[in-house]
Amino acid sequence: MTHPFAAWTELDNGTVPIEEGELFYETAGEGPAVVLLHGGMLDQRMWDEQFCWLVGSGHRVIRYDSRGHGLSSTATGDWANHDDLCALLDALEVPSAVLVGLSHGSRVALDTALAHPERVSALALASPGISGRAFTDPFVLGHIKEQVAAIGAPDGLERYVEHFLRMWVDGPHRRPSDVHPGLRERIRASATATAEAHADGVGAGMPLEVGAAGRLSEIRVPTVVFDGDLDSTDISANAHALTLAVPGARRVRVPGAAHMVNLENTALFDHELRAFLSSLAR
C-alpha cells in the first residue's frame, strides 16, 4: 500500500484480529508508544497533522480505525472498545502507551485507563466524551433528534451527516458559512464514508462501557484535557469535570475552535501536546 508518509519513515499497516472482526492500523517510528484515537463517525486520518511530527519527535505512533469505522470491521454484536484497543496493543507487542483521543476517542481512552490501567501511561483528552454522562445541551439534543428523523428518508444520509457537521464541526456559536469549507468537506467525506461502509452494523450491537463518569478520581496517570471555546456546553462540562476529578489534570482551553480542536487550532494543540509529552520524559 502506497502511503504519503512512506517517503520519510518506515510505515507499517495492516489488520489485527479482534472478537468477530479485525482492526485496521498504521504505525511508524521508534520510542515511547503513543496511540491516536479518532472521533465518532470519523477514522484515523483525522490525525494526519499530528502523526507526522509525533513520529519525528521520537515516538512509536499507532493509529487505527475503531470497530464500525473506516477500514475496520463492522459491528455484529455487543463489543468493548477498550478491549479492542488492548487486543491491538497485544498484537503490536506494546505493553503500555500514551492515549491521545478526541471525542469518542477520549471516551475509549478513559474507559481503557479504568478497565486496563496497566496499559495506559498518560492521557491527552481532546473535546472529551465520558461514558456514563448523557448529553443535555439543547443544541446537541436538537440535532440528534433531526438525525433520528433523517433515518430511512430518501436523502437521509446527507441530512444525517449534515447534522453531524452542525454539532461537531460548526458548534453552537457559528453558522456553517463561518467555518473553513475545507474542514467541513474533509469531515463530511470521512463521516459519509463510515456511514456508508458500516450501515449494516447500525443496531447490530452496543458498545460495552465502564461508566467512567463516576470513576474519574480513580485515574492515576498524567492527564491533559483540551476543549474548544466554541464547542457545546456538554463538552465544556466534561472538560471541567475531568479537571476537577482527575488528580493533577490540566485543562487547555483552545480559542477559535469548536469540537475539532486538533484541526481548527493545530498550532496551539500541537504545542501543548508536544509540551505534555516532553514533561513525561522528565
Q: What is each model feature region?
A:
Residues 80-97:
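Conserved acidic catalytic loop of the alpha/beta-hydrolase fold
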Residues 114-115, 121-153:
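Flexible "cap/lid" loop of the alpha/beta hydrolase fold
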Residues 99-101, 126:
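Short beta-strand immediately N-terminal to the catalytic nucleophile in serine-hydrolase-like folds
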Residues 101, 105, 109:
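Gly/Ala-rich beta-loop-alpha elbow adjacent to hydrolase catalytic centers
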Residues 154-210:
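Conserved alpha/beta-hydrolase catalytic His-Asp/Glu region
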Residues 14, 19-73, 88:
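Conserved HGGG/HGGXW glycine-rich cap/lid loop of the alpha/beta-hydrolase fold
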Residues 188-244, 253:
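Conserved serine/cysteine hydrolase catalytic core
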Residues 247-282:
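Catalytic active-site module of serine/aspartate enzymes centered on a nucleophile-bearing elbow/loop
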